[in-house]
């Protein structure tokens, strides 16, 4: 083959795009769009127009560079079929495998607690404000909803996997539709409140603190890290043998980039549309009421009384129902991951890695009791959801998504070629800023 043919062949490889690449682009995108998105407009809009514009600039770099770093770590293992746990064990030994198992479990379990609080508050808000029924006991509502989900999960897991997978796209479509439908209700309140002479960079309500806290909710909302390991394994098995690891890395990066663009476009449009239809004060009220933005929108349009349009009347009921479905979808998906993670920890520490010492049904029952029991307790206590995200959920995700890959890049020889890059500094900074929220929340 001539040098010209080699160049043409190389260009063909770089532009090579399969149907499976599109499928994974949409899969990563769909994984990230869940119940967490319903809280992003509240935190992003809480500080007004300037902070959310800064977040708009940061959104794509956070989504792309952080997930690409994790994908590169997954790609660094010798075994193309090895998942992230095997890869970390290869680089850092059995201790590294234990650490990654703990990180995965504690990155997902707090999300269940968050969703337990959210689904309880959303249901109670719908019950009282849309159905106009007497208030119910919080402990009873939380217990009923969790038992209902436990029964559905226990007896219809396979069916629910299919149903939840199907619901991803209607949920995304509903977010886009709501964003578009809110346009006639946009107002200039958020713009009118911008006073450049009164802007403060520092202080409790300053731009820097607002953006700093906003980074946590962005890490939480723009997150498809649970599926990155499976995604990389699939692409390595598909491309690496024929085209090599470098090509596979570029292919994974391109897919992650396109998924990030889709994700940022949908979520930021939804956030801006909510903010322009409401106001920063409304977002502060939503935070205080501890409900997702769709529930607040439903209550907001409900208060319009006789002046409601047909859309406002529809949204009053549809928004809460969409929120409930979204939360259940996210709860179910994260429950499976939490169950698997807790099962691995129990087998590893209680039975020294011997699966034969306990039946899977007994193990699943023990894990379910702990997961549902702890989720009910948190839902009953009703901590502020955004505070819980910023103090627990996002920092643990950041340690897995940002700091672990950066540590590996500086320690693992096969990742040495990625050292000294400016995007490494950015990813490390995002990870540290997110984790430092714990200190801010405590003090």
Swiss-Prot record:
Main localization category: membrane
UniProt keyword Cell inner membrane present: yes
TM helices/strands, residue ranges: 22-42, 44-64, 97-117, 135-155, 163-183, 207-227, 259-279, 319-339, 366-386, 389-409, 422-442
Molecular function as annotated in GO: L-serine transmembrane transporter activity; symporter activity; threonine efflux transmembrane transporter activity
Keyword Cytoplasm: no
A Pfam family recorded for this sequence: Trp_Tyr_perm
UniProt subcellular location: Cell inner membrane
Function: Involved in the import of threonine and serine into the cell, with the concomitant import of a proton (symport system).
PANTHER family in UniProt: SERINE TRANSPORTER (PTHR35334), THREONINE_SERINE TRANSPORTER TDCC (PTHR35334:SF1)
Name listed for the protein in its UniProt record: Threonine/serine transporter TdcC
Species name: Escherichia fergusonii (strain ATCC 35469 / DSM 13698 / CCUG 18766 / IAM 14443 / JCM 21226 / LMG 7866 / NBRC 102419 / NCTC 12128 / CDC 0568-73)
């Amino acid at each position: 083959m001539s040098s010209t043919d080699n160049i043409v062949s190389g260009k063909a490889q770089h532009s090579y795009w399969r149907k499976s690449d599109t499928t994974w682009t949409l899969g990563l995108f769909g994984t990230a769009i869940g119940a967490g998105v319903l809280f992003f407009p509240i935190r992003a809009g809480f500080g007004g127009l300037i902070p959310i514009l800064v977040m708009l600039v940061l959104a794509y770099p956070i989504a792309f560079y952080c997930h690409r770093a994790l994908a590169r770590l997954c790609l660094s293992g010798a075994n193309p079929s090895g998942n992230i746990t095997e890869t970390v064990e290869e680089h850092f030994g059995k201790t590294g495998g234990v650490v990654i198992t703990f990180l995965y479990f504690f990155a997902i379990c707090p999300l269940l607690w968050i969703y337990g609080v959210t689904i309880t508050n959303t249901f109670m808000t719908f019950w009282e404000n849309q159905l106009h029924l007497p208030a119910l006991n919080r402990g009873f509502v939380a217990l009923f909803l969790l038992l209902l989900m436990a029964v559905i999960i226990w007896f219809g897991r396979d069916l629910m996997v299919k149903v939840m997978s199907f619901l991803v796209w209607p949920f995304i479509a509903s977010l886009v539709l709501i964003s578009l439908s809110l346009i006639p209700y946009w107002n200039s309140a958020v713009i009118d409140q911008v006073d450049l002479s009164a802007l403060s960079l520092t202080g409790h309500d300053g731009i820097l603190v607002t953006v700093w806290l906003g980074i946590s909710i962005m890490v939480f909302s723009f997150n498809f890290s649970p599926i990155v390991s499976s995604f990389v394994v699939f692409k390595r098995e598909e491309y690496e043998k024929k085209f090599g690891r470098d090509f596979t890395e570029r292919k994974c990066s391109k897919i992650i980039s396109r998924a990030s663009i889709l994700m940022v476009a949908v979520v930021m449009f939804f956030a801006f549309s909510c903010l322009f239809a409401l106001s920063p004060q409304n977002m502060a009220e939503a935070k205080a009421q501890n409900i997702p933005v769709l529930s607040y929108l439903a209550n907001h349009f409900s208060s319009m009384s006789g002046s409601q349009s047909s859309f406002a009347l529809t949204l009053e009921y549809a928004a809460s129902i969409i929120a409930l479905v979204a939360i259940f979808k996210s709860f179910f998906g994260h429950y499976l991951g939490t169950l698997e993670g807790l099962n691995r920890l129990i087998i590893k520490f209680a039975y020294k890695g011997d699966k034969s010492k306990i039946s899977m049904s007994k193990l699943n029952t023990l894990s379910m009791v702990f997961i549902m029991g702890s989720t009910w307790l948190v839902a009953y206590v009703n901590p502020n959801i955004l505070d819980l995200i910023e103090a627990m959920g996002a920092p643990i995700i950041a340690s897995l998504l940002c700091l672990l890959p950066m540590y590996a890049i500086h320690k693992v020889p096969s990742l040495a070629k990625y050292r000294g890059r400016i995007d490494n500094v950015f990813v490390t900074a995002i990870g540290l800023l997110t984790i430092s929220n714990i200190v801010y929340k405590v003090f």
